[in-house]
Amino acid sequence: MSNAQQHLEKAIQIHPEFADAHYELALILKDKKEFEKSKEHFLKTIEIRPEFPVAHFNFALLLHEMKDHKTSQEHFLKAIDLDQNFANAHYHFGLLLAELEDFEEAKNNLEKATDIDQNHTLAYYHLAKLLIDPEDYEKAKKNYLTAIDIDESFADAHYYLGKLVASGLKNDKDGTLVRKPEYEDAIYHYKQTISLDKKYSKAHYNLALMYKIQKKYDDAKKHFEKAIEIVNDYSKAHFHLAMLLKETGTITADEKPSNKEEASVG
């Protein structure tokens, strides 16, 4: 007998009602993608020990992977009912609800996760991604910034914060819909994304758009080209690079001839 699975199976053979052994074996089988066998042992665990919040939680995760969303929801709720401060249960339940397009309940659960665990980076991040209404602009921005404050190396949080502030679509104090792009902040966060992941093609593309707006054409061209180098079939990058080259006559500032050279032409 040489591995954990074999010993757990032996423990269950000796003591069939050993809840912890069924639970640990279920986790191993889940990791091995043996989902049906894992499910059997989670069910047995819960049958023996119904008030086992972590078992309900991990069973819910398994059921989510198995696309049994209804039963998954039931076990997330059971885990939360048994442990009101189970941040990860709220977090993963929130992700499932978002996948099922129940966005309000998803936001409620992600926010609850951050209330319980104020260092739950991913909960802040995914909550921010769901806060797409212009009236939630500042709240979304705050959640991205909190995620970044906890984990400065969170490239996706920098990227999506860059997109948010680049759009600048929000409600003014009187409720009027306004667009107030924060281009310098967007550029900063796109640059941070690229510094963390040099092959983040979308960050190069969006940074190029910012530079194009600012008429920094050489920088824009450089990052459009970089996006295409990373993802050759990036159609939007090809299109906007083409429009940039058309707009600038394909001659960038660095390529323009000097006055002396101009005089000698023709």
Predicted regions and their residues:
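Structural signature of tandem alpha-helical TPR/SEL1-like repeats
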Residues: 1-10, 31-44, 64-78, 98-112, ...
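Eukaryotic tandem repeat interaction scaffolds
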Residues: 122, 126-129, 156-163, 188, ...
